[in-house]
């Protein structure tokens, strides 16, 4: 057996969404900050293509690279690689990374609660892990500041006509639309159609509405979040949502950044206040338990500090290798399993 590289991976999923973690075999990319390192990976694409493209990966998968932190407050940094993006932050991936760090012993576990500070490309996140019998059972993450951008904005979408949408940031940028507006329900049997429509809505939102983060160089809308109406019981709101991820797949989890963005919109519309909780439910019925912890400002914009909480499970370990005679050193994509990214 011969290989010019060996990458060590711990497999993991958070409430159904795959978020594998590279724990060895990759040197930290160049950059003075984790954000700059993530931009190198986004522009270079060599590593992302190797771990995500067939025959080693697939469109279903996200992969996280552990890197030494740049901020002295943090114990570890990580960079998220998605099929088409290298985002500032991800809720499900931060939960996977935290679980792998503790369950594998990379960071020492303290029972019943372990506190960590991690550095995502989008900023510092605080982690509280509930641990028992050597397992991180639930991860709570204080996400980066989140904010609503546009509320009730008209958007013209080919095949749908004019729909009303919100745009918001929850660690990544979203256009948010109610499922009823597009004549659909969030259920597994409509996953392909919803994902394709969601990507179409994202494209239209970038062309007609745009987005600009007040502090980061993030100038596009990444995802379409499709929602069903929120219900309230006391100080707890519950809502089903799903997120269409380019090129055209569904997030299997409730999407932590999406829940954060949705809470920011609910707060901006006067439907949620500090201290109240939000349960986000995925297309699979899994849940993230969230809280609008406090209200703040970000670059002069009203914002919130959200906390997201969920579970993750280690699924295995693997080693990715590259034989020097392999005709596909960067992998490949075919549209039967990897939708066209238009």
Swiss-Prot record:
The protein's matches in InterPro entries, at most eight in alphabetical order, are given as: Pro_racemase_fam
Entry GO MF terms: 4-hydroxyproline epimerase activity; trans-L-3-hydroxyproline dehydratase activity
Q: Which UniProt keywords apply?
A: Isomerase
Q: Which residues bind substrate?
A: 91-92, 251, 256-257
Top EC class per UniProt? isomerase
Residues annotated as the enzyme's active site = 90
Catalytic activity reads: trans-4-hydroxy-L-proline = cis-4-hydroxy-D-proline
Q: SUPFAM superfamilies from the entry?
A: Diaminopimelate epimerase-like
Documented EC number(s): 5.1.1.8
Q: Per its UniProt record, what PANTHER family does this chain match?
A: BIFUNCTIONAL TRANS-3-HYDROXY-L-PROLINE DEHYDRATASE_2-EPIMERASE, TRANS-3-HYDROXY-L-PROLINE DEHYDRATASE
Q: How does it assemble?
A: Homotetramer.
The UniProt family comment states: Belongs to the proline racemase family.
Q: What does this protein do?
A: In vitro, catalyzes the epimerization of trans-4-hydroxy-L-proline (t4LHyp) to cis-4-hydroxy-D-proline (c4DHyp) and that of trans-3-hydroxy-L-proline (t3LHyp) to cis-3-hydroxy-D-proline (c3DHyp), albeit with very low efficiency. The physiological substrate may be different. Displays neither proline racemase activity nor t3LHyp dehydratase activity.
Protein name per UniProt: Protein BMEI1586
